[in-house]
């Protein structure tokens, strides 16, 4: 049972003279409804599956692997979706077309697709979307416009216009019309600076064609999120560790328009949520390979990475690759199910929670006190700012726990900058969409928690922190 929370909110005295002398603050950029929903849900399951799966080690197909190599014998996209639900994800993101250009749907724009494979009547994208709808998951496609290795192997080498036009046609097939319905998100890898990198494209084609492709996607599917593009951008690593502190405000990159970020700060003019990807496989491989060596992280390790990504305000893509038969290995499913059950038990049954509260920031600022209703061995706190309505404000904060025997005791900032699995402490800086703090339960438990904003960012209303929620939890043993 959730204890009824007693909430005490204190504000510092106003300082009218000091305030009058300060320059007018900037208005806080706010997320779109799609960005808010994307961040509030926390994480997605990434599914790397394609021609690379049918090799022993190829992670980056240059387009030379024969289409006939694609030959799944037990494809089960329902199993993928059931696994995503079991781990607690709200969406699945599927490699509809990876770097080599092989399309997992029968594209009329290309001669390098499932139509030329060993299973020419199989539309994997179609099966994937149907499974997403069946299990209540949002569908997402990995389909980067700079990645089409097979096309670049053709003679004569395609022009920029031919290259870009094929991509636009593929987006029409995936996002336009009614064939697959609304797609929540597309994911652009290495974009827009990958030309000449993992997959070549015509000289000078990118980032020059970036705006054209953005505008085309906006036209055919206006509410589809473009991730690692104008709606969400990468934190800069694939280690399963989000940036911290993390501000979701940025300034434009001078080389690329359409809201591609160049620098991040608490007072940037554009709101841009962040995302990070990581693979479940200990090898670090994104695709499953028939080496006999692929092993999954265990549930506790998955939690450690969740804590360092979702728990620090970053959207997390956890990659769970099917094997060459077309199913996710049972050993992977087992660990994800254990993790998902433990996460749900922890998050969905808070000891106490309060919504929509505010407190002033700064030295001598206000505080929010949360009563637990009893003495409880709380060892986790989740904080969320009301980013959708008031933007991101908090730059620094403190947490204290009240012991009936010892009074108020500070919960210390983490000594581990990554808040690693097994580590503990209060993050203590930014909050944004979410921050999760874990710490050893006080000996004898506590009956109250107190939160205080000690510094704010530089947006309008930055002197007041608005929390969408403040909750106390006892972690499931798997997460300790």
Where are these regions (language model features)?
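Classical eukaryotic N-terminal signal peptides for Sec-dependent ER targeting/secretion
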Residues: 1-7
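Mature catalytic domains of secreted/periplasmic carbohydrate-active enzymes
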Residues: 19-444, 452-468, 473-476
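N-terminal signal peptide
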Residues: 10-21
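Extracellular/luminal ectodomains of metazoan preproproteins built from arrays
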Residues: 479-480
């Amino acid at each position: 049972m959730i204890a009824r929370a007693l909430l005490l909110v204190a504000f510092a005295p106003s300082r009218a003279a000091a305030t009058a002398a300060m320059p007018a603050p900037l208005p806080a950029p706010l997320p779109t409804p799609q960005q808010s929903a994307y961040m509030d849900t926390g994480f997605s399951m990434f599914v790397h599956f394609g021609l690379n799966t049918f090799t022993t080690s190829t992670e980056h197909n240059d387009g030379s692997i024969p289409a006939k190599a694609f030959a799944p014998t037990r494809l089960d996209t329902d199993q993928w979706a059931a696994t995503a639900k079991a781990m607690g994800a709200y969406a699945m993101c599927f490699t509809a077309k990876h770097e080599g250009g092989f399309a997992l749907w029968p594209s009329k724009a290309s001669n390098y697709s499932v139509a030329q494979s060993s299973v020419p009547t199989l539309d994997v994208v179609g099966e994937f979307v149907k499974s997403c709808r069946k299990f209540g998951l949002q569908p997402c496609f990995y389909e980067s416009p700079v990645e089409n290795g097979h096309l670049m192997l053709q003679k004569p080498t395609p022009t920029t216009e031919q290259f870009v036009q094929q991509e636009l046609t593929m987006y029409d097939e995936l996002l336009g019309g009614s064939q697959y319905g609304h797609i929540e998100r597309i994911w652009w890898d290495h974009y827009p600076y990958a030309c000449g990198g993992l997959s070549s494209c015509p000289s000078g084609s990118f980032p020059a064609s970036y705006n054209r492709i953005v505008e085309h996607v906006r036209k055919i599917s206006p509410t589809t999120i473009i991730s690692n593009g104008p709606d969400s951008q990468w934190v800069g690593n694939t280690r399963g560790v989000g940036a911290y502190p993390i501000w979701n405000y940025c300034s434009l990159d001078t080389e690329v328009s359409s809201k591609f970020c160049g620098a991040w700060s608490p007072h940037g003019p554009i709101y841009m949520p962040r995302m990070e990807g990581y693979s479940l496989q200990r090898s670090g491989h994104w695709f499953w390979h028939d080496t006999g060596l692929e092993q999954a992280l265990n549930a506790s390790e998955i939690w450690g990475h969740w804590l360092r990504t979702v728990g620090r305000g970053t959207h997390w893509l956890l990659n769970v690759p099917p094997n060459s038969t077309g199913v996710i290995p049972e050993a992977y499913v087992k660990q994800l199910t254990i993790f998902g059950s433990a996460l749900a038990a922890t998050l969905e049954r808070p000891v106490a929670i309060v919504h929509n509260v505010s407190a002033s920031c700064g030295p001598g600022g206000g505080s929010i006190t949360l009563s637990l209703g009893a003495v409880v061995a709380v060892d986790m706190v989740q904080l969320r700012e009301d980013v959708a309505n008031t933007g991101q404000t908090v730059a620094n904060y403190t947490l204290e726990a009240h012991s009936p025997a010892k009074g108020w005791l500070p919960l210390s900032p983490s000594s581990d900058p990554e808040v690693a699995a097994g580590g503990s402490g209060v993050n203590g800086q930014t909050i944004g969409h979410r921050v999760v703090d874990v710490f050893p339960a006080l000996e004898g438990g506590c009956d109250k928690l107190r939160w205080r904003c000690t510094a704010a960012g530089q947006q309008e209303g930055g002197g007041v922190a608005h929390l969408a929620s403040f909750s106390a939890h006892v972690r499931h043993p798997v997460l300790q």
